[in-house]
From Swiss-Prot:
Stored CDD domains: Radical_SAM
Active site, UniProt feature: 105, 349
Catalytically driven reaction(s): adenosine(2503) in 23S rRNA + 2 reduced [2Fe-2S]-[ferredoxin] + 2 S-adenosyl-L-methionine = 2-methyladenosine(2503) in 23S rRNA + 5'-deoxyadenosine + L-methionine + 2 oxidized [2Fe-2S]-[ferredoxin] + S-adenosyl-L-homocysteine; adenosine(37) in tRNA + 2 reduced [2Fe-2S]-[ferredoxin] + 2 S-adenosyl-L-methionine = 2-methyladenosine(37) in tRNA + 5'-deoxyadenosine + L-methionine + 2 oxidized [2Fe-2S]-[ferredoxin] + S-adenosyl-L-homocysteine
PANTHER family recorded: 23S RRNA METHYLTRANSFERASE, RADICAL SAM CORE DOMAIN-CONTAINING PROTEIN
Cofactor: binding comment: Binds 1 [4Fe-4S] cluster. The cluster is coordinated with 3 cysteines and an exchangeable S-adenosyl-L-methionine.
Naturally occurring in which organism (per UniProt): Bacillus anthracis
Subcellular location: Cytoplasm
Gene: rlmN
Enzyme class: transferase
Protein name, entry field: Probable dual-specificity RNA methyltransferase RlmN
Lineage, highest ranks first: Bacteria, Bacillati, Bacillota, Bacilli, Bacillales
GO BP annotation list: rRNA base methylation; tRNA methylation
E.C. no: 2.1.1.192
InterPro entries: Aldolase_TIM (IPR013785), Methyltransferase_A (IPR040072), RlmN_N (IPR048641), RNA_MTrfase_RlmN (IPR027492), rRNA_lsu_MTrfase_RlmN/Cfr (IPR004383), rSAM (IPR007197)
Length: 362
């Protein structure tokens, strides 16, 4: 009987590229190399993203020869579901296993306006935010575009049973999306394409901790995707304490990049601001934040933090959250408090994965 380690080693040795990593034009190029007509690419995408088949044999309008070529060239398997937690509010958290044994998290959130999914872009994270469970254990590797796509496909398959669909997505799961930029953009283009899952660009949001060169690059992309910055502090000193990335990419330089993005795209930016009891949640912090954002076309999303056992931060009291919000509103800042979801499951980013890793080491 094969051990888990031996199976993982075999998977690494025999791994083929994921078919879910291919954009339509890349599929067309591959078909041309195989002497096949390029219209077959649309048929293949239809099987993958509309019918969501799990094997090539089901692609009945393709020749046997083409199905064999696909099978020999590309892996069609997606992800193995290790854990599926369902909250009382309908939020579902998936722990998926990758081909090499690593695990990642994906979250389905239900809203009045539809179903939203939060996807992961890396196994672990190197950014080192002091409040985040995702950084525990460091960065293991980047996800391929197909592994990010597969998260959406798997969640959509789960929704197919109730004839629902994923209507929006946020790239705010484990990892720093801009630290895996090329695979991120490949994923977004596949998911957005009318032959893919066809999720509208304006229904997708990418969040970054502030990798400044990639913000300038993102401003030049042709997709009208919503953009969010994990800010969490109104000044450099406090931000460096909470987010070590601020030592490399200073807050004043970050704000310049953000202003360039807003002016270049004409789109509003969202600032994510987690509230940590006694750290960044006082009235003076709100006043300083309002001054920092003055003149910037933006929205502030206040996030009551989830408790992470491995971290020391505590939740801001409810009345203090409302006072912080009021202080911003009184100074003309567009602000909302994020609705909490999945409070009765391991909802904080990286929490379920960290719990699973801890159990594996016992």
């Amino acid at each position: 009987m094969e051990t888990t380690v031996r199976k993982q080693k075999k998977n690494l040795e025999t791994k083929k590229p994921s078919i879910y990593s291919l954009q339509l034009h890349e599929m067309q190029d591959w078909l041309k190399e195989q002497g096949e007509p390029k219209f077959r690419a649309g048929q293949i995408f239809d099987w993958l993203y509309k019918k969501r088949v799990k094997n090539y044999e089901d692609m009945s309008n393709l020749s046997k020869g083409l199905r064999e070529k696909l099978s020999n060239s590309f892996d069609i398997t997606t992800l193995n579901t290790l854990v599926k937690q369902t909250s009382s509010d309908g939020t579902i958290k998936f722990l998926f296993q990758l081909y090499d044994g690593y695990s990642i998290e994906t979250v389905l959130m239900r809203h009045e306006y539809g179903n939203s999914i939060c996807v992961t872009t890396q196994v672990g994270c190197r950014i080192g935010c002091t409040f985040c469970a995702s950084t525990l254990g460091g960065l293991k590797r980047n996800l391929e575009a197909g592994e990010i796509v597969a998260q959406v496909v798997e969640v959509q398959r789960a929704l197919d049973e109730s004839e629902e669909r994923v209507s929006s997505l946020v790239v705010m799961g484990i990892g720093e999306p801009f630290d895996n930029y090329d695979n991120l953009m490949g994923f977004l283009r596949i998911i957005n394409h009318e032959k893919g899952l066809h999720i509208g660009a304006r229904h997708m949001t990418v969040s970054t901790s502030g990798i400044i060169p990639k913000i300038y690059k993102f401003a030049e992309e042709d997709l009208q995707i919503n953009f969010a910055i994990s800010l969490h502090a109104p000044n450099s000193e406090l931000r460096s304490k909470l987010m070590p990335i601020n030592r490399a990419y200073k807050l004043p330089d970050l704000m310049e990049a953000i202003k360039y993005y807003v002016n270049r795209t004409g789109r509003r930016i969202t600032f994510e601001y987690g509230l940590f009891g006694g750290e960044n949640d006082q009235v003076e912090h709100a006043e300083e934040l309002a001054a920092l954002l003055k003149g910037v076309k933006c929205h502030v999303n206040l996030i009551p933090v989830n408790y992470v056992p491995e971290r020391d931060y505590v939740r801001t009291p409810r009345e203090q959250i409302f006072l912080f919000e009021k202080t911003l509103k009184d100074r003309g800042v567009n602000v909302t408090i994020r609705r909490e979801q999945g409070h009765d499951i391991d909802a904080a980013c990286g929490q379920l994965r960290a719990k699973e890793r801890k159990e594996e080491t016992r």
